[in-house]
Amino acid sequence: MKKIISISASVVLMVTVSFADISEKQVDAYLEVSGAKIMFDNLQQQIGDMVDQQAQQSGEKVDPMALVAVKDVMTRDENFAKFTAHIKTLDENDYKNIMAYYATELGKKSAKIAENSDIETMEKELPIFMTKLQENPPSEKRMNLIKDIIDAMDMDELQKNMLREMFVSVNKFAPAKQQMSSDDIDKMVESFTPMLEQQVQISTLFSYKDFSDKELEEVLNYAKTKSGKAEVDVIFAGLVDYMKAVMSQMFQELLDQEKAK
C-alpha cells in the first residue's frame, strides 16, 4: 500500500458559466492552441517515467504489467472525456475571448509553457534555474506578480484538491480498520499544503522564467477577466474530475496486480 501511495503522490505532484455547450470541434481547437493537447499527449510517458523512478528510488523493480496498467488508466478515452466535458460548458462568448487570447503573441507564449513541462526538460533545466534563482532572487514586484497569478489561476487549490482525491482513493481501498475519516483526510492535505505551495511557486517561476514583468501583468489581467476566470474554472473542475477517476481506477489496477502475484 505504501508503494501505491508513493507512486500516486508522484503523479499528483508532477501534473462554470453560461451553459450553451460548445462543439467537439471547438474543444479540439482549444486543446490545440492552449497547449493542453501537448500536456495530455505527453502524459503517458511522463507517468511511466515517474513510476519507474519511484520504484528505482525504493530499490524495487517495476512490474511491466503495473506500468501497462498505469498507462492504460491515464489514457482511457472515458477519463479524458471527464476533463473535456467541462470545457464544453464554456459559453460561446467566453470561448471566443479565450481563443482570441491564445491568438495573441502573449497567448502563444503562454501555450508553449506546456512544451517545457515534460519530465526530461524539468530534470535538465530546473536545477540550473534553481541555482540561478538563489544567486539572483526575483524582485519583490516579480514575486508578487507570480503569487497573484497563482491565486488568480487557483493553482494552490487545484493541487490540494488533486491531493485530496489521491487520499480519498487510498482510503477507499484501505482495510476497514485503517480507513480515515473525512476530517483526517483534510488534516493530511493541510499537512502537505506548505510543501505543495512551495512547489507551485517554484514551478510557476520556472514556467514564466522567459516572461517579462510586463508580460506577467498581462497574463494576470487576462486571468482576472470573466473569460479568463471561466477558463480557470473549467480546467480546475476538469482536472479534478479526471484525477478522481484516474486515481480510483489506478489503485484498483495496482491492487489487482499485487493480488495476482
Q: Positions of the model-derived regions?
A:
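Sec-dependent signal peptide recognition
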Residues: 2-10
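Sec/Tat signal peptide C-region and signal peptidase I cleavage site
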Residues: 15-21
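Second-shell loop/turn segments in exported
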Residues: 29, 33-36, 68-73, 83-86, ...
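Outer-membrane beta-barrel domain signature
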Residues: 113-114, 118-126, 130-133, 137-138, ...
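Extended amphipathic alpha-helical interaction segments
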Residues: 119-209, 213
